[in-house]
Amino acid sequence: MTRTYVITGTASGIAAATSRILKEAGNKVIGIDVKNADIEADLSTKNGRQEAAKKAIELSHGSIDAVIACAGLAHPDPQTVSVNYFGVTEFLSALLPTLSQSPSPRVAITSSMASLMPNSPELVAAMLADDEEKALAIAQGLVSAGAGAEQLIYGSTKRALSRWIRRESIKPAWAGAGIPINAVGPGIVKTPMVAGMIATPEAVRDILQMVPMPLNGFMEPEAVASLLIWLSSPDNTHTTGQTIYIDGGSDVALRGENIWDLALA
């Protein structure tokens, strides 16, 4: 069965691999990125998100079966907030009426293993309150504070995104419309975004201390793409609200085997 997918971030990395695999299987893919995509748009702005959604609906002729949101930044600056969180949530909201008309609508999002890392609760709260202006001000404050505070920005965007997915997944707009909405939480993936982080043996050693991956080490984008494709396929009928960590064991290595007691603490 041929399906129509809208995928953000298709110029490189996980989204590029996902797009290629889906196209090879005969599906239609509408790719979005700042350049080198079917739709060139800046998801860091409200106008860019709305324009991208409008063009996606036009190119799909009003028929969208799944959205896979992979576009993201890892820079320790406020723009990362706009792209990683609002560039997902507002974009999805704009596509929801069209997506809901599919017989098997699905949403899959790229979060990160960083959602489990230290974050700024204040920044996370501002994003979850859909207050972009406040969130940007908080992020700028972290940059201005220095001493590494700006490094909390990326993890905060992914924590907020995974929490938004849990919050929204069971609401009538999503569950009531038959739309599973989930995320993947990758560990270290061999993409242009992280190339500089694993460029030397010393860098590899340092990052594995922070993000241990005892099962098979760093992964290729195709490994994550396969999970995104299943989550956004008709085969996924009941999995929703989840961030599934595809991380070579990082989550377990860092949090241990008993996360249930931690959840109740």
Specify the residue positions occupied by each region the protein language model found:
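Canonical Rossmann dinucleotide-binding motif of NAD(H)/NADP(H)-dependent dehydrogenases/reductases
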Residues: 1-30
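Rossmann-fold cofactor-recognition segment
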Residues: 34-49
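Short C-terminal tail/terminal secondary-structure segment
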Residues: 122, 240-265
